[in-house]
Amino acid sequence: MTATWEKKEGNQGVLSVTVPAKKVDQAIDQAFKKVVKQVNIPGFRKGKVPRQIFEQRFGVEALYQDAVDILLPEAYGEAIEETGIKPVDQPEIEVNQIEKGKDLKFDATVTVQPEVKLGEYKGLEIEKQNADLTDEELQEAIDHSLGHLAEMVIKEDGSVEEGDTVNIDFDGYVDGEQFEGGQAESYDLEIGSGMFIPGFEEQLVGLKTGDEKDVKVTFPEEYHAEELAGKEATFKVKINEIKYKNVPELDDEIANELDSDADNVEEYKENLRKRLSEEKKVNAENVEKEEAINKAVNNAEVDIPEAMINNELDRMMQEFAQRIQQSGLNLETYFQISGQDESQLREQMKDDAEERVKTNLTLNAIANAEEVEATEEDIDKELEAMSTQFNISVEDIKKTLGSTDIVKDDVRVKKVIDLLLDDAKLVEPSEDAEEESEDK
């Protein structure tokens, strides 16, 4: 087999491939064995028609397409390996010659991974991050942990407040008519969660158990159900029950419940301070790395094929669907609640997808320029870290992955990021940046 690559405009080119006649004839033989099983000719049992009779009746040309289907995958794969190109999408195949006793010739129009023109990536000025834990941050973490131990208590007196969970019945109307999906009974809604149409939850604040109210809202213009988009609606709402979070006080018993290694409040706070301090140091370094990556990527130039962006969007949609499922929802329910559809969500994600692709291309280009490689020792360390993190044996991880190539690529990228930060110049943040950080 021979293959040649001719670069065309943009990120496309033509891969011209020739497969020897011997392989073509072998593929035609395989095609006959497959096709003859489906052929009915009077006087012969199904699958027992002689080759000569078949070709007299249908012609050898009837086998060509199946022969091409047999030959193409292997020939295309070998051609990619021989020419060293990196396709990012399915090729467009044009068969130029397929005939018994002759070579198969085909052209594959291929979109390939683009070349990256690197800009400045060494000696980047990076803002140094504050890694010191404050008392306020420690207290916030304590309050957050106590919140997980909070019990939901029925509010006998008083009205709905932000953070309360209300049990409601509601019945929605548009132009005086009920609409599909606009009714529910005994529905639990946390006020401030943003789960309902904008303006709905806010109008329940101040109501008491047993109260009824007409809640008037307007569906978003981009609402997934076109018949409701932009329409004014009225929901007849009844408050069945109000619950609030009863947060416990921190004492020695609670401290031990939150941290089994702590016998009292002081030990709990000290252990928590150590853990949070380490986390903040790691987070600070990650922010610095992120800035280094962003600057290196922004300084690079690359023409990204639409196919690469679409492939990344597919991955992002899968990731999003998994996160939604973990929260107990599915995409269909999410779209109903959010007022979006899939095409709108993909469009919303498109810039991030393009940024992801550019980042990956840029970091790999830097790895090539700096001859950064992942050694077997690097890969083994990463697998051990994954084993510890996910509590899975290294062997099981290898079986699941099927290959360590993904791990190798990840390690290589991590080494590039470390290189960017090691070469960077850490500078103290400006006063404006410090004030902005304090405001957060």
Swiss-Prot record:
<dbReference type="GO" id="GO:0061077">
    <property type="term" value="P:chaperone-mediated protein folding"/>
</dbReference>
<dbReference type="Pfam" id="PF00254">
    <property type="entry name" value="FKBP_C"/>
</dbReference>
<dbReference type="InterPro" id="IPR037041">
    <property type="entry name" value="Trigger_fac_C_sf"/>
</dbReference>
<dbReference type="GO" id="GO:0043335">
    <property type="term" value="P:protein unfolding"/>
</dbReference>
<keyword id="KW-0697">Rotamase</keyword>
<protein>
    <recommendedName>
        <fullName>Trigger factor</fullName>
        <ecNumber>5.2.1.8</ecNumber>
    </recommendedName>
</protein>
<dbReference type="GO" id="GO:0015031">
    <property type="term" value="P:protein transport"/>
</dbReference>
<dbReference type="InterPro" id="IPR027304">
    <property type="entry name" value="Trigger_fact/SurA_dom_sf"/>
</dbReference>
<keyword id="KW-0413">Isomerase</keyword>
<dbReference type="InterPro" id="IPR046357">
    <property type="entry name" value="PPIase_dom_sf"/>
</dbReference>
<dbReference type="GO" id="GO:0003755">
    <property type="term" value="F:peptidyl-prolyl cis-trans isomerase activity"/>
</dbReference>
<dbReference type="GO" id="GO:0051301">
    <property type="term" value="P:cell division"/>
</dbReference>
<dbReference type="GO" id="GO:0043022">
    <property type="term" value="F:ribosome binding"/>
</dbReference>
<keyword id="KW-0131">Cell cycle</keyword>
<dbReference type="GO" id="GO:0051083">
    <property type="term" value="P:'de novo' cotranslational protein folding"/>
</dbReference>
<dbReference type="InterPro" id="IPR008881">
    <property type="entry name" value="Trigger_fac_ribosome-bd_bac"/>
</dbReference>
<dbReference type="InterPro" id="IPR008880">
    <property type="entry name" value="Trigger_fac_C"/>
</dbReference>
<dbReference type="GO" id="GO:0005737">
    <property type="term" value="C:cytoplasm"/>
</dbReference>
<dbReference type="Pfam" id="PF05698">
    <property type="entry name" value="Trigger_C"/>
</dbReference>
<keyword id="KW-0143">Chaperone</keyword>
<dbReference type="GO" id="GO:0044183">
    <property type="term" value="F:protein folding chaperone"/>
</dbReference>
<comment type="similarity">
    <text>Belongs to the FKBP-type PPIase family. Tig subfamily.</text>
</comment>
<dbReference type="InterPro" id="IPR005215">
    <property type="entry name" value="Trig_fac"/>
</dbReference>
<dbReference type="InterPro" id="IPR001179">
    <property type="entry name" value="PPIase_FKBP_dom"/>
</dbReference>
<keyword id="KW-0132">Cell division</keyword>
<feature type="domain" description="PPIase FKBP-type">
    <location>
        <begin position="163"/>
        <end position="248"/>
    </location>
</feature>
<dbReference type="InterPro" id="IPR036611">
    <property type="entry name" value="Trigger_fac_ribosome-bd_sf"/>
</dbReference>
<comment type="function">
    <text>Involved in protein export. Acts as a chaperone by maintaining the newly synthesized protein in an open conformation. Functions as a peptidyl-prolyl cis-trans isomerase.</text>
</comment>
<keyword id="KW-0963">Cytoplasm</keyword>
<dbReference type="Pfam" id="PF05697">
    <property type="entry name" value="Trigger_N"/>
</dbReference>
